[in-house]
């Protein structure tokens, strides 16, 4: 007897969709709307309050002059020092450096790997 190949109990099936009957009015064609309306349910003032962030917005406005300030590393490319344009892709490396292109990111990675290799070679052997 092979392990893991024991017979399994039969899976219980749920109600099939073929057993569900839908009444269709023959008077309308597809795409016609009769008296169909959508109702927007308003939960009142307290409804939306549950989903708001508990951030003190007044303090943030004082700190940043009413606008949000991006982190300093998101302003310029970490390799070529060009400005990072809003709405453009940003390429990250080690979580603390942003780059304008894949090429700049790869060059920084190669530079860091070179520094690591030199550190290993220069360390005294025991």
From Swiss-Prot:
PROSITE patterns: ZF_FLZ (PS51795)
Upregulating conditions: Down-regulated by glucose, sucrose and mannose.
Pfam family, one: zf-FLZ
GO terms of molecular function: kinase binding; zinc ion binding
GO cellular component terms attached to this protein's record: cytoplasm; nucleus
Transmembrane among keywords: no
Alphabetized UniProt keyword annotations: Cytoplasm, Metal-binding, Nucleus, Zinc, Zinc-finger
Predominant localisation class: cytoplasm
FLZ-type ZnF: 72-116
UniProt subcellular location: Cytoplasm; Nucleus
Keyword Iron in annotation: no
Source organism superkingdom: Eukaryota
Residue intervals passing through the bilayer: none
Gene Ontology BP terms: response to glucose; response to mannose; response to sucrose
PANTHER family: FCS-LIKE ZINC FINGER 5, FCS-LIKE ZINC FINGER 7
Role played: May act as an adapter to facilitate the interaction of SnRK1 complex with effector proteins, conferring tissue- and stimulus-type specific differences in the SnRK1 regulation pathway.
Similarity remark: Belongs to the FLZ family.
Subunit structure: Interacts with KIN10 and KIN11 via its FLZ-type zinc finger domain. Interacts with KINB3 via its N-terminal part. Forms homodimer and heterodimer with FLZ1, FLZ2 and FLZ15 in vitro.
Name this protein carries in UniProt: FCS-Like Zinc finger 7
UniProt organism field: Arabidopsis thaliana (Mouse-ear cress)
Lineage of the organism: Eukaryota, Viridiplantae, Streptophyta, Embryophyta, Tracheophyta
